[in-house]
Amino acid sequence: MTERLQKVTGIVLKETTLNENDKIVQVLSKELGVIKIYAKGAMRLKNKFHSSIGIFTYSDFVVYKPANSDLYQLNEASVKHIFHGLSENIDFLSLAMYMSELTVEVTVPNDKNNDILRLFLNTLHIMTSKRWNVDMCKAAFEMRLMADIGFMPNIVGCCHCGRYEAETFYFIISKGEMYCQNCFHTAAELPQDVIKLKMPSVMALRYFILADMEQMFSFDLAKPYQLPVFKICEEYVLKQTGRFYNTLNFFKD
């Protein structure tokens, strides 16, 4: 073998079966971003790589890339962590599938982004440990992911006067902008995609985007304030990426 072996650590986002023996997996890796790995023989139950490259398995991979190929070839693999709770709850699994599809859509192949990998792993951990409900996990992932790829909305204060706190704010999905109750009618022309927010909802959005990764899942939001947050996070993703996701339909059903 003349190609250089390289060790990467990451989680399997997607798998494509080629035949009864082989498959291709897409891995969100710490070192190379999202890459495609060809795993020869991995479909066989007795294959040494079978458990290491299962969907949503976090593993160490030793790979090499042949010249003039978009695929990495798998040389070795070992499991670091399996999120067993995903297979026990259809809501958990369907959210993980949506997170995977969204991540593949917005990341650039072979472009390293450790923050996205940390976000993905932390969200799965919080969800499977049942520390947050699945809808809160979804909203946090969506908004933090948009911020990590450069589409952070302006939720620090009113876009017109800079006000940090108000009884009511208005968030405009298409613009990613927020206005206080005093400025909204003068600074905007009452667009259709506007959502009214109270301060607890605003603080939740700020936490999703601005808090340290270890702290962004560490607060409680009362149910009356959750729905506007869920709506903003989902619709903002759809607006910024310009498409819908089949896995989102599956999650919502």
Question: Which residue stretches match the model-derived regions?
Answer:
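Non-catalytic alpha-helical scaffolds and adjoining flexible linkers that form interface surfaces
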Residues: 1-24, 28-253
